[in-house]
Every structure is written in C-alpha cells, then in structure tokens.
Amino acid sequence: MSTFPWLTTIILFPIVAALAIPFIPDPTGKGRPIRWYALAVGLIDFALIVYAFTNFYDLNTPGMQLWESYDWIPEIGLRWSVGADGLSMPLILLTGFITTLAILAAWPVTLKPRLFYFLMLAMYGGQIAVFAVQDMLVFFLAWELELIPVYLLLAIWGGHKRQYAATKFILYTAGSSLFILVAGLAMAFYGDTVSFDMQTLAAKDYALGFQLLVYAGFLVAYGVKLPIVPLHTWLPDAHGEATAPVHMLLAGILLKMGGYALIRMNVDMLPAAHAKFAPVLVILGVVNIIYAALTSYAQRNLKRKIAYSSISHIGFVLIGIASFTNLGMSGAVLQMVSHGLIGASLFFLVGATYDRTHTLILEEMGGVGQKMKKIFAMFTACSLASLALPGMSGFVAELMVFIGFATSDAYSLPFRVIVVFLAAVGVILTPIYLLSMLREIFYGPENKELVEHEALVDAEPREVFIIACLLVPIIGIGLYPKLLTQIYDATTGQVIARAREVLPTLAQQTEQPLGILPMVAPQLKANAQ
C-alpha cells in the first residue's frame, strides 16, 4: 500500500503540463517542439498509470484501491475522492494508452498546434478523472470538463461541416448531462443523510419508484454517450468531420465513459431498478446491433460506415450488462476495452486513407491496394478484428456475452433464444459490410486517376507503429483473455452478486417488469420460489 497520491498526480499532471504549452518556444511556428512535449507528457503519465497498477493494485481485491480523499469545498460537502477498482482500472489504462497514441497520430497537425495539444492534454486528465473520482458532484464536473476540448477539436480542426457536427455534439452531450446532475442531486439529498460520496449513495435504501426515476435519468445521459439508438445521431456526424486523433479519442475512450457510468451507477447503485430495466437494455442492445449494422451496410461514406459499425458493437455491451451473469458482465467490460482498441485502429486508418485519397466516398476509391500495401494489410487486420475473428479480442468479448446471456436464469428460455438469434444475425451482417468495404477501397474497380496520383503513398513508419501498438493487445487479449479479465473479475463479480440479490424480491412484487416482456416474469417468479 502506498500513501503517495497516485491518481491525483495522474489526473492533474497532463492538465498542469498543458498550461505550460503557451511558453514553449516554437521558432518555425509549425509546432514541432510542442508535439514532442505533448508526446513526452503522454508517455510519462501513461508510465505513471502502469507503475501504479503494477506495484500498488491488488487483482484479488474487488473494492476501491489507490484511495485518496480530501476536503475540497466543505461548505457544500464537496470532497476530492478518487480511487480505482476492477471496473475503472482497465479504462484508466486504456485512456493512457489510446491518448498517447492519439498524440502521435496528430503529428501532421500544423494548424494552431499550441491550442490543439493543450486540448488533447486537458482531455487526457478529464477522462481519467471520470473513471477515478468517487464523488457524484466531482464526477459531473469531470464529465462536463471533457466536453469542451472535444467541441473545440471538432469545431476548429474538423471537416467542411465541422460547426454543425460540433454544435450537435455539444447539444446532445451537454443537454443529456443535466440528467446526471438532477439524478445525482436527488440521490445525494434522499433520506436523512446528504452526501455526494458514491459509496454512501450506493448504501442508501431507496424506494423502488425513486430508483426507477433516477435510473431512467442516468440511462438517457449515458445512452447518449455510449451511444444507444435512438440517441446516437450525433456520433456519425462527429466522426464524419473529426480528424484521425480525435477519432481515436472518440471511439477509444469517450464512448466508454457511458458504459462505465452505466455499470457504476445504474447497476451497482440502483440494483432494484436495474432488474426492472434490464429487459429494456437487452432490447435496446439488439436494436443497436441490427439497426446500426444495416445502416452501416447502406453508408457510402467511409467514416460514417465505421461509425455505425461502432454503434452496432455497443449493443453487446448492453446485453452483457443486462445478463445478470458474471460471464456476461465480464464480456461487456471486455467488449468496451476491445471496442476502444479496434475502433481507434480503424478510425486512424480511415484518416490515413483519407489523407492520401482526399475522398471518403467508396465509389471514388478502388484499386488503391496496389499502391498502399501496408495500409491495405493493416486495414484488413483491424477489420477482421472488428468482425470478431477468432484469436482477436472482439471474438472473445462477443462470445462471453453470448454464453453469459444464453445461460442467464433471469430470463425465460424463449426470450433468450430470440435475443441470441437476433444478435447472431448482427454478427453475420458485420463481415458483409466490412469485407465489401475492403473490396471497394483496395480492390476495385480501379480509379486510375487516383491510383496514379503521386500523393498515393504507402504507410510511413509512424503509422505502422501506431497500428502495431494497437494490434498487440487486440491479439494478446484474443489469445489469452485473462490478461484483461483478471483485472476486473473480482469487481464485476461483486456487482453482479449485488444485482442478483433483488431478483427474487422483484419477482414477488410484480408479474411483469415495467409492464413488458411477459415471458421474463415466469423465470423471475421461479427464482423467487
């Protein structure tokens, strides 16, 4: 055990380091020293995360570790409380890893480099804070902090419709954040004790009706960030206009904040309401998988195609969260990490392809594989990971969710069969739209004007290095999932145990959770008996 404030240092270091960027000399005005400085800050902070994890984190302890708690504004009961458990630690590691690679991916950025890297580093600290803080009010502040850098990164460095995409992003995400504030305040002031501490909030005995209202508010807020259909429409627009490093942060980290908060607050703090809403999450998960897969197939814009593919894979996170099994929940967390790695790699390659072809329309591409053999090979490998090829992380995550839900005793057999069948249809659709995408980009029909253009060059060493760094954990987790699952199994097991405690009680209280899915009620009633 260490008394050093590791998490506070990890959160504040990139933010404080960003404040020094205006004072870094840049004789050429192209940002070269600023790039190296930002990369050094990213590497140092990631090294601190890895050091704290390897030396002071116990894999067998389900509760909070690396705990710190200090009075901040005692007049309103606000404390700076941070900690990491099995749910937050994998995502903190993912944040450090993806952000450092995103800084390296931003090497070609020459427009306002000081502001760009300042925002990247500020976002770095804000995202880690979301996963680490254990005070509801500070969580809300951290959640809001990361919105500002993303908005500016879209609005200044985005594509032709960047203002529209940035405005839509801020309206959706900032508007939905109000639900977090209202629901969090309601929990804090419920009962005789007023507290923003998450552990205190989780221990309160809330009335079922109150839980349902708060759960619904959180679900809207986190459903926008995940995103869940129909709250997803901001994401294709944001991805459609973002640059490659911003893509990596959006797909790799930002969306995971929604999944993390859904487990942390909806499942762990409001288990009775979760048992009621779980069938709804399952249905929303299936809708995500099928709808987004079909929409992805219909897209002719490469960025939007990958964006909808990303939304489709989020459906497995929802099904795993609602499975009420250790295996299903473990698969959901694994899918979040896998989705972050694969999504970041695909969007980086989309950006690399666009930098050379200057088009995102599939009909305008064709035959570029003969000039870009390395990019073709990397794009193929990452697409195979996305379609859940055995031996890669996506396969293990989706298989765990399938088995976890199929063996769940919280749902009737007919309902489980229907859900598994529909989810399997989504799995079948994935290779259809991804492999056809690869064919249209790299095989043909050949666009001779594009293929013969001198700007159409293959990947440089920096780009190969970034994809290699992403493929190593994708393949490593796919071959040996315990590399990741051992970090969070103790915590997710505790979360599921708490969620399952209320199933018999709810079965006695009602025959039809939320008045829907009568097929779910008989199994819940059987559990009660």
UniProtKB/Swiss-Prot annotation:
Domain of life: Bacteria
Topology in the lipid bilayer: Multi-pass membrane protein
Catalyses which reaction(s): a plastoquinone + NADH + (n+1) H(+)(in) = a plastoquinol + NAD(+) + n H(+)(out); a plastoquinone + NADPH + (n+1) H(+)(in) = a plastoquinol + NADP(+) + n H(+)(out)
Entry EC no(s): 7.1.1.-
Keywords: Membrane, NAD, NADP, Plastoquinone, Quinone, Thylakoid, Translocase, Transmembrane, Transmembrane helix
Cellular compartments per GO CC: plasma membrane-derived thylakoid membrane
Membrane-spanning residues: 4-24, 36-56, 91-111, 115-135, 137-157, 169-189, 209-229, 243-263, 277-297, 314-334, 335-355, 387-407, 417-437
GO biological process: ATP synthesis coupled electron transport; electron transport coupled proton transport
Compartment(s) where it occurs, according to its Swiss-Prot or TrEMBL record: Cellular thylakoid membrane
MF (Gene Ontology): NADH dehydrogenase (ubiquinone) activity; ubiquinone binding
Family membership: Belongs to the complex I subunit 4 family.
Its job: NDH-1 shuttles electrons from NAD(P)H, via FMN and iron-sulfur (Fe-S) centers, to quinones in the respiratory chain. The immediate electron acceptor for the enzyme in this species is believed to be plastoquinone. Couples the redox reaction to proton translocation (for every two electrons transferred, four hydrogen ions are translocated across the cytoplasmic membrane), and thus conserves the redox energy in a proton gradient.
Name of protein: NAD(P)H-quinone oxidoreductase chain 4 1
Source species: Thermosynechococcus vestitus (strain NIES-2133 / IAM M-273 / BP-1)
